[in-house]
Amino acid sequence: MILVLAESAIELVPREIWSHPAVASDARRRGKRPGEILLDRARHHPAMAGLEDGARRGRPDIVHQVLLVFQYSLLNRRGLGRVYIHTRGDYIIQVKPQTRIPKNYNNFVSLMEQLYALGRAPPHGDSLMELHRGSLAGLLEQLGGRWVVLHERGARRRFAELGAALLNSVVVVGGFPHGDFSNRWVLEKAEAVYSVGDEPLDAAQAVCRAVAAAEASAGLI
């Protein structure tokens, strides 16, 4: 299973709010420039009022939660999973299977800021995470040009059937807190669209169910 977390709400603080007191004080407290820190709704809410599409931005915690679910799963540890993060600013983050994601959120934020600064982490030796410019369309084409989507309006399948469908597929999940994919073709061109619950789920919950179904199909549970 190759997971693609798409249009993820992770980015550095945009230039237009660098001078806002909420951003400036946070950067000063952390000993960094405003443009070197992640945009975070929990810390920068007052500054985000005028940002375009602000309700869907500043949620790096979504990426953190999804990576914790996926990277520590049996599916990944047995070599049956890979994950890519596509960001709303059209960056691609490739996470190698052996990468141990920090469980502490503040440590995760520092890791991601390092990744944005250097394009890789750690700075020396073999890279475990890499960041480069790239579109969602380009990534999906690179991964074979065929994918399925987890979406609240998708078709329901029995657990075993869902697991069999996901195990060897590229699986796209939205990495944003509200709304729908801005790239409508993600749904329109998907081979299938599946729902994993009777109501909308957070990205981490959807990924958890998808991983469990794929693990069951692989005989891991």
From Swiss-Prot:
It comes from the Archaea. Its EC number is 2.1.1.-. GO terms for biological process: rRNA base methylation. InterPro entries: Alpha/beta_knot_MTases, Rbsml_bgen_MeTrfase_EMG1/NEP1, Ribosome_NEP1_arc, tRNA_m1G_MTases_N. One of its GO terms (molecular function) is rRNA (pseudouridine) methyltransferase activity. It is an enzyme of class 2 (transferase). The record marks R59, R100, K103, N107 as: Interaction with substrate rRNA. It catalyses: a pseudouridine in rRNA + S-adenosyl-L-methionine = an N(1)-methylpseudouridine in rRNA + S-adenosyl-L-homocysteine + H(+). Transmembrane segments: none annotated. CDD domains: Nep1-like (cd18088). Belongs to the class IV-like SAM-binding methyltransferase superfamily. RNA methyltransferase NEP1 family. Homodimer. This is Ribosomal RNA small subunit methyltransferase Nep1. It comes from Pyrobaculum neutrophilum (strain DSM 2338 / JCM 9278 / NBRC 100436 / V24Sta). The gene is nep1.
